[in-house]
Amino acid sequence: MRKYPVGIQSFESLRKEGYLYIDKTELIYRLISTGKYYFLSRPRRFGKSLLISTIEAYYSGQKELFQGLFIDGTEKNWISYPILHFDLSAQKYDSAESLYDILNDILAKWEKKYGTEPSEVSLSLRFQGIIQRAAEKAGKGVVILVDEYDKPMLQAIGNDNLQNTYRDTLKAFYGALKSKDQYIQFALLTGVTKFSKVSIFSDLNNLMDISFDKRYAELCGITENEIHTWLEEDLYDLAANTNMSYEQVCTSLKERYDGYHFTEDSNGLYNPFSLLNTFARMKFGNYWFETGTPSYLAQLLKQNKYNLTRLSNEVVTNDLLNGIDTLANSPIPVLYQSGYLTIKDYNSRFNVYTLGFPNKEVEEGFISYLLPYYAHVQPAESAFQIMSFIDEIEKGKIEAFFLRLQSFFADTPYEMIRDLELHYQNVLFILFKLLGFYTEAEYHTSDGRIDLLVKTGKFIYLMEFKLEGTAEEALAQINEKHYAIPFQADGRRIFKIGVNFSSKTRNIQKWIVEEI
């Protein structure tokens, strides 16, 4: 029976215990043969830790682990190097002392092996001393591997003072890579994000960022070709277990888990965590999203007064995508680098990228996740509320639908009055985007109004929301613009609905329904 490496981050365990391994060693060999200092950002659960572990096994000279892989037939000299492996992923960073304590513990462990000097009083000096003594003791360069270098910075988003403290600590710490260059054989730092202007790497001008490098676009993640090369029989097993055809399974996998692009002209990549979970459990699910979404993402969107309608079609420059500045007014870089948005198109003339959701799992999961942050609904109630909305709209229960919608706007904070139009737009966008996963829904905004078209098996709803004005004016707008004409021969019952919001009550004030 096939063993799928769900959650397996140790290359040694994976190989010795007979788990599936999709061979990435050709790219790894290219990486280690053509450069020395690298940085790679990829979303969480995308295989970064396994990549680090694989490189560690290579530099440990564990030739037996690579039997049958590309690198086995290419590498002739299997040499063991001293390795300094940092794993910052599993720690909690909530104070200035926490980062210091964690780095101190790591260094203390290595100092027991490589010694220390009285003059090495700072974290940076201690790290430099360890690098030099490890290299001198082994008679060869040191390999430095850092997994999730940015975990402290990410946990401090929203706390500028703590971020500044972490930035200064990490900048000095990683500066050892440059000052002890002659003692280093290879270095790779990985993380979810690239903090640019906060200057962690400002002194490391020798660090090559391969996050946007087409040559290494497939280093993490799984391509469609790799699925058919390594998992072809598994596709048939999945089809049998889900009562689907082979073609339906391939289409569903692509819709749910494919679609990640990290350069403008790369092949689409499947999320490895969701893909492997699907094969391991022999059923589809939102596996990546269920492992947790950081709360700071929703907070960033709200703090920056971001219009959520732009999520599906955000146009950005390369400079914006390529780093995160905590003082900037855009949440887009962190959404992109965290895997919630991806490259959909590229305009070479203007050197701009169009971003959107990579796939169905991310789009449905992220929109559902945002609902409690914007509407008056508890996270545990979200699924029930959406199910009720769909039931009401499919059964023509218009009054119940709008009463429920009113409850979504209940307790809108008074401070939202300045951005009331954006607040209304965002709540309605989330709601009708969620409805659109189960019904046909179209959403348009312009000049203080929102147009909504919802189609179900029996009904067509044409809705006009006025953010300033009356429900009567909203209904008149539908009639004047002849919105219903394209649907008059449809056969379904058609309802025109005019709705207005009150800035005084910060809620829906009135709705008028007219059936054709």
How should each PLM-predicted stretch be described?
Residues 163-169, 467-484:
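Mg2+/Mn2+-dependent nuclease catalytic core
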Residues 428, 452-467, 481:
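Conserved catalytic cores of phosphodiester-cleaving nucleases, focusing on short active-site segments
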Residues 143, 459-461, 495:
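Structural motif
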Residues 173-180, 333-341, 429-433, 477-497:
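Metal-dependent nuclease catalytic cores in nucleic-acid-processing enzymes
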Residues 1-420, 435:
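Phosphate-binding site recognition
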